[in-house]
Structure formats: structure tokens, C-alpha cells
Amino acid sequence: MADLSVNIGELQMKNPVMTASGTFGYGEEFSDFIDIARIGGIIVKGTTLHKREGNPYPRMAETPSGMLNAVGLQNKGVDYFVEQIYPRIKDIQTNMIVNVSGSAIEDYVKTAEIINELDKIPAIELNISCPNVKQGGMAFGVSAKGASEVVKAVRAAYKKTLIVKLSPNVTDITEIARAAEESGADSVSLINTLLGMAIDAERKRPILSTVTGGMSGAAVKPIALRMVWQVAKAVNIPVIGLGGIMNWKDAVEFMLAGASAIQIGTANFIDPAVTIKVEDGINNYLERHGCKSVKEIIGALEV
């Protein structure tokens, strides 16, 4: 078997396969289906400083090659996570990573400070696609300045591995990635969902209560792959690739484009065992190509 281990900053992972936030619960929900300890890293659902009810229903819609979601970061807040969830998941034998969201910079900072105290949480993933309520609702991650401000503030408060999740809904994602790196990010993950919408023609109404939502699934893969390739060339920190990864071949393509690790999202809803199948598929690919380590294929695309 090939060496599948990779490092994301100081975070050591047994393999490059991770789960995307919001698609794998807190990990424990999948333990009846697979050995979740085999996964390189589990990113739990988005956590905010205070409880959020999320958006009204309907907030999910199927599309021809993926799905739209407008869940709205529904969660019970970081205190609930610390008191109720953390004790249940802290002994899972893999990297448990918390996705952190907020409506203001101080929300991100306070949440990160609380999670920093949890010994068994070695990293956070910062969701900077959230709207900044103090700046008219514009998402933090759509400008280099906005991204830099929130990443710098969290970096000062958080002492472990800091992953910054980038929005694809921007003019130049490499500019945002460089801003995150310069502000102290240990890694960037991309892409978050693309903004899309669905319409019920008979009712002449939008399908989602919010009109628009986040597009994910196979349809976004070519866009995600291109952005990962661009960002991997633009920064010197590890890149985590996600967006439309449905099988091992997709995962290998992202790594060839420069990703040090990958996240699987929408595919978890289709096949609860997809993470394990992807890990096995990557190993088989490496053996077939005579590679002793997965690191040999990171950025190995010949252009």
C-alpha cells in the first residue's frame, strides 16, 4: 500500500480524504455505515457563536447534475457544540475539524477562541462566504480586504491550524487566496458553493424560499478544478480541493491540479461509503502508476 499521509500546516492526516462541512453531520451519524476513523479529516457542520434557525423551507432543490441548498447555517451555537457534541466526538480516531461562520468579525474571533480550548480539535475551517452584516451584507470573502480583515483577526486569536474556505463567486479567486495566505492562513480550501437558482415554471415561483442558493455536485467540478489549479500556482500554502468530487478519479484530478487534500460533499448524500471508496481508489491509482507516496501526484499535472 502506498503512503497516503499528507500535512496541512501542522495538521497531520493519515490520507488526503476529508468530508465537506454540512454534508457529513458531526461524523457520528455515518458510523453505522463505515469506519469513520479511516477518513483523513471530518469537517463538522458550520458552527456560529449563537444559535441559528436557518432559512425557511423549502431550502434544498435537486438539479440535473447536483443540488442547490439554502439551509442558512442552521446550528445550535458554539456553546451547545462544546457541551453536547464535543464530548461525543472527541475520541473519534481522526482529525475532527470545526467549520466556523459568523456575521461579524468579532463573532468569528469569539467562536475561534472557544474552539481553540478544545484539545481534540486540531484545526478550524473559516467560512468567509458569510455576509458581513456591518458592511451591508457583502460577504467577507468576495474582496481581498474583507478576507484579510477576518483572517487576521482570527489568526491572532486561534493558535492551531487555520484553513480558510474560499468563495468562487468572485472575479479573481487567486487574489483572495493570496490575501488569506498573507493574513496568516495555514491552508485554503476551495471551492465553496456557486450561487444558483431554480424555478418552478408551473407556479412561476422560485423553488427555494430564499430564491437563490448554493450550487454543488458534479456540475461544478470543471470550475472548481480550474480554480484549484490557479490557486495552487498562486500560493505557497497547502490547497484543499473540493467541488463536484464524486469518485476517486475526480479526487486524483484535483490532486494533480495541485490540491494536497480533497473534500467530498454532495456525494455523501448519494453514497455514505464514498469516502472509503475514494481512499481505496487513490491507493490503487498510486500503485498502478508506481508511486510510493500520494505526495508524488500533488501538482503533477503536465501542462
UniProtKB/Swiss-Prot annotation:
Q: What class of enzyme is it?
A: oxidoreductase
The protein's UniProt keywords, in alphabetical order, are: Cytoplasm, Flavoprotein, FMN, NAD, Oxidoreductase, Pyrimidine biosynthesis
Superkingdom in the source lineage:
Bacteria
Any binding details for the cofactor?
A: Binds 1 FMN per subunit.
Task: Name the reaction it catalyses.
Answer: (S)-dihydroorotate + NAD(+) = orotate + NADH + H(+)
User: Which CDD domains does the entry link to?
Assistant: DHOD_1B_like
The record's SUPFAM superfamilies line, in alphabetical order, gives:
FMN-linked oxidoreductases
Q: Which cofactor does it need?
A: FMN
* GO terms assigned for molecular function: dihydroorotate dehydrogenase (NAD+) activity; dihydroorotate dehydrogenase activity
Mind telling me which InterPro entries this protein's record contains?
Aldolase_TIM, DHO_dehydrogenase, DHOD_1B, Dihydroorotate_DH_1, Dihydroorotate_DH_1_2, Dihydroorotate_DH_cat, Dihydroorotate_DH_CS, Dihydroorotate_DH_I
The record, for NCBIfam families, names: PRK07259.1, pyrD_sub1_fam
UniProt function note = Catalyzes the conversion of dihydroorotate to orotate with NAD(+) as electron acceptor.
- PANTHER family, from UniProt? DIHYDROOROTATE DEHYDROGENASE (FUMARATE), DIHYDROOROTATE DEHYDROGENASE (QUINONE), MITOCHONDRIAL-RELATED
Q: Please state what the protein is called.
A: Dihydroorotate dehydrogenase B (NAD(+)), catalytic subunit
Which species?
Bacteroides thetaiotaomicron (strain ATCC 29148 / DSM 2079 / JCM 5827 / CCUG 10774 / NCTC 10582 / VPI-5482 / E50)
